[in-house]
Amino acid sequence: MTDVWRLAIFVLMVNVLNDQVSCSGPPGPVGYPGVPGVPGPRGPPGQPGAAGRPGDPGPKGPSVKCPCRERSAFTVKFSGRLPPPSEPVVFTEVLYNTQRDLKESTGVFNCVEPGNYHFSFDVELYHCKVKIGLMKNHIQVMEKHQLSKNEYENASGAMIMPLRQGDKVWLEADVETEEPDQAKVVIYFSGFLISS
């Protein structure tokens, strides 16, 4: 009899436990948000973005008129009869002298705009001996010699010199020959302002 009761109580307990496990009530209300976690580590760099579109054109700048003037320059040529010695060579042909800083009647360059000038000369001679000098304010600053007998010869020189307003520059040529009828001399003389 005791065993029967024990079995009945055991079966009853099992049924009660099964009812408790299989039965659940309705869902409860949503809980409060939890505390935020700590920030995670920095991620790797992303890929470069696409190029942006070109910006709008800027406003047009102001127009400025350059106050520049033409720089002093000349090129002249001498040919024909032999020039007199120890005097400025008076040139027979003007190739360029727009600013008229070289006085064509005297062959003398007069500095109007102070600055650094480049002067050069080239002499072609035949059957004669030539000494040519570059002069500045009656002082010789360069001298070249050349001798020609039975063929054409050349002599040339160039120099950069600073000039002040009113300074004067010219060429002088001393020509010696035993055959004046055959002797020939052609001289080119150039100068121009490099910087002021």
From Swiss-Prot:
Q: Might you report a single GO cellular component term?
A: extracellular region
Q: Which UniProt keywords apply?
A: Collagen, Hibernation, Secreted, Signal
Chain intervals for the UniProt region annotation (Disordered) = 28-64
Is Signal one of the keywords UniProt gives this record?
yes
Which branch of life, at top level?
A: Eukaryota
Q: Which PROSITE patterns match?
A: C1Q
Q: Which SUPFAM superfamilies match?
A: TNF-like
Positions of the C1q domain:
67-196
InterPro entries linked to this entry = C1q_dom (IPR001073), Collagen (IPR008160), Collagen/C1q_domain (IPR050392), Tumour_necrosis_fac-like_dom (IPR008983)
GO biological process, any = hibernation
Residues of the signal sequence? 1-23
Q: For this UniProt entry, which segments traverse the membrane?
A: none
Q: In which tissues is it expressed?
A: Plasma; synthesized in the liver.
Q: Can you list the disulfide-bonded cysteine pairs?
A: none
Q: Does the keyword Protease apply?
A: no
Where is it localised?
A: Secreted
Q: Which residues form the Collagen-like domain?
A: 25-63
* Bias type Pro residues, positions: 28-47
Q: What does this protein do?
A: Plasma proteins HP-20, HP-25, HP-27 and HP-55 form a 140 kDa complex via disulfide bonds in the plasma and are hibernation specific.
Q: What is this protein called?
A: Hibernation-associated plasma protein HP-20
